[in-house]
């Protein structure tokens, strides 16, 4: 595939070609749906589908009506999430090639310029560097603009097809696959995302969407921090820069280490304050940029009173039940693995329900699982299980 294997040694036997192949990373043009809602168009079904990021119907033009105020509520503060297998690259000097270009608006030269700007957003604040190579050369990342039916999307269970204009904009694959696909039905531009009344179409910011998908290609899932570029609704919010949330995600995935030997000297000279952008990329450890995030998914949890240890054979299906006897008190269940929040199900790894969690025992799923039942800020119950796989 033109890229090196990057799985942890203990996970290499458990993770096959389909392990999370297609990143659960499609980015939808929620701003289009938001505007149509603002104009009073009947988009409730499309809005719900887009939030779930599956089977969103195509959204066409609508008859303008008297604008209504569109309000959005944020119920809780969130943060980054990583893949359950911690999929990552084993090197920082990544290459990419562009296999096809958009047919609407942007020329190949403009497309290359936009992609380079998106890659710079990551290289400016991380140890990664990105270099374009010729299409016939092997590369780590492979970028293309494709129609609805592209590559193996019709036969693959983990790679879905595009849905036409104003739906899913792009999707990416986790390491070490390196694929980044853009919907060629969209109208890509280098400016801000906006609706063109002259053309009657949405013009979508290529740099913004590409930067989001690059984050997935580096191993980050959708962030739950509202101000993060990796947020599912990043297009709607219009964030144009990486947040501290993405940096913490990279630190957690790749380690937080100084990249050059003069970091300690630079830190003593005050560079951590006056050259913060440079020091975040080169010297995060010396400048104490590795500290833990200040925005927990929920309020700080209390330590479980008891952790049950289970030694199970590989391949066994295990189910944990949490707080079934107290759910009638209208408590909400939060699941964690090794103190990381679990927000989604992952086919072949774990199935997340309201009050239960099922996993397939393997090297990837080893760890400590915790559930916390809360009602508002009050902890109603806490349970914890430590899973070890028997060879």
From Swiss-Prot:
<keyword id="KW-0165">Cleavage on pair of basic residues</keyword>
<keyword id="KW-0393">Immunoglobulin domain</keyword>
<feature type="binding site">
    <location>
        <position position="222"/>
    </location>
    <ligand>
        <name>Zn(2+)</name>
    </ligand>
</feature>
<feature type="disulfide bond">
    <location>
        <begin position="322"/>
        <end position="371"/>
    </location>
</feature>
<dbReference type="Pfam" id="PF00413">
    <property type="entry name" value="Peptidase_M10"/>
</dbReference>
<feature type="transmembrane region" description="Helical">
    <location>
        <begin position="19"/>
        <end position="39"/>
    </location>
</feature>
<keyword id="KW-0862">Zinc</keyword>
<dbReference type="InterPro" id="IPR001818">
    <property type="entry name" value="Pept_M10_metallopeptidase"/>
</dbReference>
<feature type="active site">
    <location>
        <position position="213"/>
    </location>
</feature>
<keyword id="KW-1015">Disulfide bond</keyword>
<keyword id="KW-0645">Protease</keyword>
<comment type="similarity">
    <text>Belongs to the peptidase M10A family.</text>
</comment>
<dbReference type="GO" id="GO:0005789">
    <property type="term" value="C:endoplasmic reticulum membrane"/>
</dbReference>
<feature type="glycosylation site" description="N-linked (GlcNAc...) asparagine">
    <location>
        <position position="93"/>
    </location>
</feature>
<dbReference type="GO" id="GO:0031012">
    <property type="term" value="C:extracellular matrix"/>
</dbReference>
<comment type="function">
    <text>Protease. May regulate the surface expression of some potassium channels by retaining them in the endoplasmic reticulum.</text>
</comment>
<protein>
    <recommendedName>
        <fullName>Matrix metalloproteinase-23</fullName>
        <ecNumber>3.4.24.-</ecNumber>
    </recommendedName>
</protein>
<keyword id="KW-0735">Signal-anchor</keyword>
<keyword id="KW-0325">Glycoprotein</keyword>
<feature type="glycosylation site" description="N-linked (GlcNAc...) asparagine">
    <location>
        <position position="233"/>
    </location>
</feature>
<feature type="glycosylation site" description="N-linked (GlcNAc...) asparagine">
    <location>
        <position position="149"/>
    </location>
</feature>
<keyword id="KW-0865">Zymogen</keyword>
<feature type="disulfide bond">
    <location>
        <begin position="272"/>
        <end position="287"/>
    </location>
</feature>
<dbReference type="Pfam" id="PF01549">
    <property type="entry name" value="ShK"/>
</dbReference>
<dbReference type="InterPro" id="IPR007110">
    <property type="entry name" value="Ig-like_dom"/>
</dbReference>
<dbReference type="InterPro" id="IPR033739">
    <property type="entry name" value="M10A_MMP"/>
</dbReference>
<dbReference type="GO" id="GO:0008270">
    <property type="term" value="F:zinc ion binding"/>
</dbReference>
<feature type="topological domain" description="Lumenal">
    <location>
        <begin position="40"/>
        <end position="391"/>
    </location>
</feature>
<dbReference type="InterPro" id="IPR021190">
    <property type="entry name" value="Pept_M10A"/>
</dbReference>
<feature type="glycosylation site" description="N-linked (GlcNAc...) asparagine">
    <location>
        <position position="317"/>
    </location>
</feature>
<feature type="binding site">
    <location>
        <position position="212"/>
    </location>
    <ligand>
        <name>Zn(2+)</name>
    </ligand>
</feature>
<keyword id="KW-0479">Metal-binding</keyword>
<keyword id="KW-0256">Endoplasmic reticulum</keyword>
<dbReference type="InterPro" id="IPR006026">
    <property type="entry name" value="Peptidase_Metallo"/>
</dbReference>
<feature type="binding site">
    <location>
        <position position="216"/>
    </location>
    <ligand>
        <name>Zn(2+)</name>
    </ligand>
</feature>
<feature type="disulfide bond">
    <location>
        <begin position="263"/>
        <end position="283"/>
    </location>
</feature>
<dbReference type="InterPro" id="IPR036179">
    <property type="entry name" value="Ig-like_dom_sf"/>
</dbReference>
<keyword id="KW-1133">Transmembrane helix</keyword>
<dbReference type="GO" id="GO:0004222">
    <property type="term" value="F:metalloendopeptidase activity"/>
</dbReference>
<dbReference type="InterPro" id="IPR013783">
    <property type="entry name" value="Ig-like_fold"/>
</dbReference>
<keyword id="KW-0472">Membrane</keyword>
<feature type="topological domain" description="Cytoplasmic">
    <location>
        <begin position="1"/>
        <end position="18"/>
    </location>
</feature>
């Amino acid at each position: 595939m033109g890229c090196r294997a990057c799985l942890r040694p203990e996970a290499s036997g458990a993770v096959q070609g389909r392990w999370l192949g297609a990143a659960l990373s499609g980015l939808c043009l929620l701003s289009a749906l938001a505007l149509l809602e603002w104009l009073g168009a009947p988009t409730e079904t499309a809005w719900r589908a887009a939030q779930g990021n599956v089977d969103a119907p195509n959204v066409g033009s609508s008859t303008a009506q008297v604008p209504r105020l569109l309000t959005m509520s944020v119920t809780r503060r969130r943060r980054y999430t990583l893949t359950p297998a911690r999929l990552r690259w084993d090197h920082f000097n990544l290459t990419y090639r562009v296999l096809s270009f958009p047919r609407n608006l942007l020329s190949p030269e403009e497309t290359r310029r936009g992609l380079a700007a998106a890659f710079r957003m990551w290289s400016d604040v991380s140890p990664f560097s990105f270099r374009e190579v010729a299409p016939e050369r092997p590369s780590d990342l492979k970028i293309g603009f494709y129609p609805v039916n592209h590559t193996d999307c019709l036969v693959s269970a983990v790679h879905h097809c595009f849905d036409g204009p104003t739906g899913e904009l792009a999707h990416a694959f986790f390491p070490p696959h390196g694929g980044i696909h853009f919907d060629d039905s969209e109208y890509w531009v280098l400016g801000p995302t906006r609706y063109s009344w002259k053309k009657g179409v949405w013009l979508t910011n290529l740099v913004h969407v590409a930067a989001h998908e690059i984050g997935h290609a580096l191993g980050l899932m959708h962030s739950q921090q509202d101000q993060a570029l990796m947020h599912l609704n990043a297009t709607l919010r219009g964030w144009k820069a990486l947040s501290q949330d993405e940096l913490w995600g990279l630190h957690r995935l790749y380690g937080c280490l100084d990249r050059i030997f003069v970091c300690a000297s630079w830190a003593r000279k005050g560079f951590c304050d006056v050259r913060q952008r440079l020091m975040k990329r080169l010297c995060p450890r010396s400048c104490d940029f590795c500290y833990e995030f200040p925005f927990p998914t929920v309020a700080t949890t209390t330590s479980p009173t008891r952790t049950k240890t289970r030694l199970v054979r590989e391949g066994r299906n295990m189910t944990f039940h949490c707080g079934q006897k107290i759910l009638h008190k209208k408590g909400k269940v939060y699941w964690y693995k090794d103190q990381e929040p679990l927000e989604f199900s992952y086919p072949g790894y774990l199935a997340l329900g309201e009050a239960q969690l099922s996993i397939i025992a393997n090297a990837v799923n080893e760890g400590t699982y915790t559930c916390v039942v809360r009602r508002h800020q009050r902890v109603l119950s806490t349970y914890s299980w430590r899973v070890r796989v028997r060879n």
